[in-house]
Amino acid sequence: AEFVEIYNKNITRPGADRLLNWLETTDFFTAPASTRFHGACECGLVMHSINVYNAMMQHFFTEGESAESYAICGLLHDLCKANFYKVGTRNVKNDVTGQWEKVPFYQVADQLPYGHGEKSVYLIEHFMRLKTAEAIAIRWHMGGFDDAARGGCFAVSEAYNTYPLAVKLH
């Protein structure tokens, strides 16, 4: 409810309604944000997205900036994780009983191996156009943890030097 409220209040450009309708056909609102780090729980992805939006607004937003851009970046930067995880089971030894038990865990089931930030941009642009600064911010929101940056690519540095919104989302 909070995500949809923030989204509808701030994101009004053409296609935004179609994007939200599509989101509701995915597991975005119930999916985890990761398999073992932040938000590795049911609804972790939507909670993480709201938290990033709130942090951006609280720490960086100033009068005259685009509230819509902040909402798009904060709420949709991890859109790539919709329909990305599946629940599997693994055997874990119960410390109390000494018995092996099947326990659920999240695992990656990437149906569109397009990268991380770039996949979010790709999915968003199926429905609505992004401003260049928004696309750059979402593409590089992982910073030095992005596979391209870890592989020696310097584009993230140039993106952060040129687009302040990218630094704020990271």
Locate the predicted segments by residue.
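Non-catalytic interface/linker regions that flank or bridge core catalytic/transmembrane domains
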Residues: A1-A31
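Residue-level recognition of alpha-helical structural elements
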Residues: T12-G15, C41, E68
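All-alpha helical catalytic cores of prenyl diphosphate-utilizing isoprenoid enzymes
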Residues: R18-T25, H38-I50
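Divalent metal-dependent catalytic cores for phosphoryl transfer on phosphate-bearing substrates
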Residues: T35-G39, M47, N54, Q58-H170
